[in-house]
Curated annotation (Swiss-Prot):
Disulfide bonds: none annotated. It comes from Arabidopsis thaliana. It comes from the Eukaryota. The keyword Ribosomal protein applies. GO terms for molecular function: structural constituent of ribosome. It holds the Pfam family Ribosomal_L38e. One of its GO terms (biological process) is translation. GO terms for cellular component: cytosol; cytosolic large ribosomal subunit; cytosolic ribosome. This is Large ribosomal subunit protein eL38z/eL38y. Belongs to the eukaryotic ribosomal protein eL38 family. Keywords: Ribonucleoprotein, Ribosomal protein.
């Protein structure tokens, strides 16, 4: 089941959870989607600013597998 997260802080807290497995980053022309897979839900954050997306990618937890699509 998918769920959408609207705040960057909430997304980072979700990515730091113990059951978070991986993050997939999907880029299109004007939007970047970060998808974190947890045990029950797939959480999605939509970012419209490329600079914020790059900062967010650097601040992801180091133990998480990150995949650019």
């Amino acid at each position: 089941m998918p769920k959408q997260i609207h705040e960057i802080k909430d997304f980072l807290l979700t990515a730091r959870r113990k059951d978070a497995r991986s993050v997939k980053i999907k880029r299109s022309k004007d939007i970047v989607k970060f998808k974190v897979r947890c045990s029950r839900y797939l959480y999605t954050l939509c970012v419209f600013d490329q600079e914020k997306a790059d900062k967010l990618k650097q601040s992801l937890p180091p133990g998480l597998s990150v995949q650019d699509l």
